[in-house]
Amino acid sequence: MASVSELACIYSALILHDDEVTVTEDKINALIKAAGVNVEPFWPGLFAKALANIDIGSLICNVGAGGGAPAAAAPAGGAAPAGGGAAPAEEKKEEEKKEESEESDDDMGFGLFD
């Protein structure tokens, strides 16, 4: 779990990003001092250096995205025919989605003995 010092630096960096101001050690220190929080002196510099070359906006948007999905394996028989294999699979998925939506419309959440 993050300490108060870490959270103070994180929130300071987010405030600076929201105001479209460059995140620097001095600016983080100024915000922390204005908030009246006591942090160890190395935290603001550490966060400023860590966020120097990172797009904080994309970092915020991709929180929880985790690692990427593994790449799909190529078919064993070689390359698939152009456009031939993908269309039936898409049609099956669409049919399954339609069936699921029809079933969910019928089930109103009432059980037999409710």
UniProtKB/Swiss-Prot annotation:
CDD domains: Ribosomal_P1. Residues 70-79 have a biased composition (Low complexity). GO terms for molecular function: protein kinase activator activity; ribonucleoprotein complex binding; structural constituent of ribosome. The modification Phosphoserine is found at S101, S104. GO terms for biological process: cytoplasmic translation; translational elongation. One of its GO terms (cellular component) is cytosolic large ribosomal subunit. Belongs to the eukaryotic ribosomal protein P1/P2 family. This is Large ribosomal subunit protein P1. The gene is RPLP1.
